[in-house]
């Protein structure tokens, strides 16, 4: 980034990278580790449900091979169908963060998904879990549909960000509801992270050009033919989109305006 002061603040933490990555769906551990390093991301989300309660070198070689002085763990509650399940996963996520040396890490990516077919977030369950976790001192990053009113309610509850989906998780369909995403971005006083559905670097750049504060990716990199190359492409796309947003695009005109060069 050209402007080194253009940082992302979530809760009481400040980050230089606006690209966050997921940790699943990679073909090999080597692909995952190399992609994470290449991306220069600083926030890595991990599904608590897929991890053992006690981390050892044998059962979590992937996590143990990462530098947690450079990465901030974002435990997620994926697989939770109710608010109660998500709350339990959030507390387990904090325990896992402690085992990685991040005792002060109370971040949680809140996912309450009651529909196993389409994997769309449950707004009622999300609100219920978010209210409880915020009161317990968690830094809550809720995954939601692109619903402007829901985003405002979650902000009012004290969530640290909102994370509206671009399109259904893992679909690679891109940004299906740009109008609602723009409304959320314009109305939010907390960071807006576009999460889910981004499949290409151009879509990541577009998210940032809209004014989003960051993007979270997983499948687009993990399932690319060459994940490491896609990780670099996404890193550059997010940086380019952010710079383009800060620079301010030219005004659109109804017809060509002649300019003397």
Curated annotation (Swiss-Prot):
This is Thiazole synthase. Pathway: Cofactor biosynthesis; thiamine diphosphate biosynthesis. It comes from Trieres chinensis. Belongs to the ThiG family. Catalyzes the rearrangement of 1-deoxy-D-xylulose 5-phosphate (DXP) to produce the thiazole phosphate moiety of thiamine. Sulfur is provided by the thiocarboxylate moiety of the carrier protein ThiS. In vitro, sulfur can be provided by H(2)S. It catalyses: [ThiS sulfur-carrier protein]-C-terminal-Gly-aminoethanethioate + 2-iminoacetate + 1-deoxy-D-xylulose 5-phosphate = [ThiS sulfur-carrier protein]-C-terminal Gly-Gly + 2-[(2R,5Z)-2-carboxy-4-methylthiazol-5(2H)-ylidene]ethyl phosphate + 2 H2O + H(+). Pfam families: ThiG. Homotetramer. Forms heterodimers with either ThiH or ThiS. GO terms for cellular component: chloroplast. InterPro entries: Aldolase_TIM, Thiazole_synthase_ThiG, ThiG. SUPFAM superfamilies: ThiG-like. The gene is thiG.
């Amino acid at each position: 980034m050209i402007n080194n002061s253009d940082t992302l603040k979530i809760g009481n933490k400040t980050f230089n990278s606006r690209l966050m990555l997921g940790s699943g769906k990679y073909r090999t551990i080597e692909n995952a580790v190399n992609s994470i390093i290449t991306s220069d991301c600083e926030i890595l989300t991990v599904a608590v449900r897929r991890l053992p309660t006690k981390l050892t070198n044998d059962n979590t070689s992937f996590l143990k091979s990462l530098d947690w002085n450079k990465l901030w763990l974002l435990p997620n509650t994926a697989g939770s169908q109710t608010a109660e399940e998500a709350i339990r996963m959030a507390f387990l996520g904090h325990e896992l963060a402690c085992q990685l040396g991040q005792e002060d890490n109370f971040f949680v990516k809140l996912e309450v998904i009651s529909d196993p077919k389409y994997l769309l977030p449950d707004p009622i369950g999300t609100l219920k879990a978010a209210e409880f976790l915020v009161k317990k001192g968690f830094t809550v990053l809720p995954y939601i549909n692109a619903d402007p009113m829901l985003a405002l309610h979650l902000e009012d509850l004290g969530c640290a960000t909102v994370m509206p989906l671009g399109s259904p998780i893992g679909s690679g369909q891109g940004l299906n509801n740009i109008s609602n995403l723009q409304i959320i971005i314009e109305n939010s006083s907390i960071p807006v992270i576009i999460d889910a559905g981004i499949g290409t670097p151009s879509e990541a750049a577009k998210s940032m050009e809209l004014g989003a504060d960051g993007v979270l990716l997983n499948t687009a990199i993990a399932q690319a033919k060459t994940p490491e190359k896609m990780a670099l492409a996404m890193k550059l796309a997010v940086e380019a989109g952010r710079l383009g947003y800060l620079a301010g695009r030219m005004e659109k005109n109804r017809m060509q305006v002649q300019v003397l060069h």
